[in-house]
Amino acid sequence: MSEVAAPVRVACVSVSAALGGSERVLLEFAARAARYGIEPTVVLPKDGPLAEALGTAGVAVAVAPASEGFLALSQRTRGAPDVWELVRGLRDWARAIRAQLPAGTRVLYSNGFKAHLACAGIPGYRRIWHLHEFPPERTGPIWPLLAAALSHRTIAVSEAVAHAWRVPRLLTPTVVLNGVDLELFRPAERTFWVHDALAVPRAARLIGMPAVFAKWKGQLLVVEAFERAASQLPDVHLVIVGGAIYDTAAERGYAEQLVRRVSRASQGGVAAPRPLNDRIHFLKFQPDPWRLYPEFDLVVHYSTRPEPFGRVVLEALACGIPVLAAQAGGPLEIVEAGRSGWLVPPNDPAALAGAMIRAAGADLAPLRGAARRRAESRFSADRHAEEVARLLRTVASGNG
């Protein structure tokens, strides 16, 4: 009788304790990992929503404290003080992570640029980087070369990300498309709780934009597009959902900027503009987003630069909600244009306005069914967890 292989003990290191897209991917993997021979401990730099959600899912969590100054550094910060803060922060966080690793840990599975570098400073473990982002353009080939030198394996969330990181003969990331929990994210009857919370007439149609409040997520472009389209969509309201959950220096003040922009939104000519702020609404970050999507008629996802994957796009499709998405990056691999949604040229508010008008006039019933079928065909959280676990076991065996 063959023996059941012992589970592989893995430390899943995340630079963020918030609950954005990549953190939800980690949460869904960790909650399923034991089914596929992985014993995970998620290591975070501080307590937060992710730690709470992991605890609810029964996943072990360890806090390896990192300084707030280090965590606030973003890809756009630069200069000698920032470099020193980064080096010191990485050194200290690597020590803290090492102190929290459970006995028997074999693999460091990192999520986020700072997590990748911190894990590289901990000798004696196999390392696998999960690439949720494109390498920063201004650094040229540095990050892909670092990945080739400092990791034993890399996972990319999309073909677009894999292509951006690939270095001939040195680095070929394995593509594992993200998934979602198809039991949570599923079509449901509308309850009108969003309409009621925002005091919007139940007869109104809603375009939803769930996204972290960050400049590159494109909320300002979506507001401009809605201004252009609003006169032809008199019964449509725009709902911007989210919050400033990542406290990096580059994004401070953006939420206030967005609120000011919406307060100035108007439709009509320059001579006689009519305020639109009664048709553009804010809804705070929703920790249970599967309750949110069924309340929308359409979801818009319009980042200003290519999205590495686009989890919001997938969540909406899984709930049977058609999507308007920028025609770049990961959404190209998720949305079947004309079947489960529409792909729109990026950074073009006029094109997005036209797409809003066309979508609002379309029969959405066939797209709703196609959206759900698309999610079911390739994007389950179980499939994702199984593929990631297989790679972790391979790396742990020394074959990665």
Predicted regions and their residues:
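Conserved acidic donor-binding segment of nucleotide-sugar-dependent glycosyltransferases
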Residues: 327, 336-338, 342-349, 357-362
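Carbohydrate-associated surface elements
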Residues: 160, 179
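Conserved donor-binding/catalytic core segment of Leloir-type glycosyltransferases
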Residues: 11, 201-217, 223-226, 239
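Nucleotide-activated donor-binding/catalytic signature segment of Leloir-type glycosyltransferases, i.e.
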Residues: 252-284
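Short hydrophobic beta-strand element within catalytic cores of glycosyltransferases
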Residues: 313, 322-325
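A short helix/loop element that forms part of the nucleotide-sugar donor recognition site in Leloir-type
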Residues: 186-200, 368, 372
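Acidic donor-binding loop of glycosyltransferase active sites
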Residues: 294-308, 321
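Short His-centered aromatic/hydrophobic patch
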Residues: 93, 109-116, 131
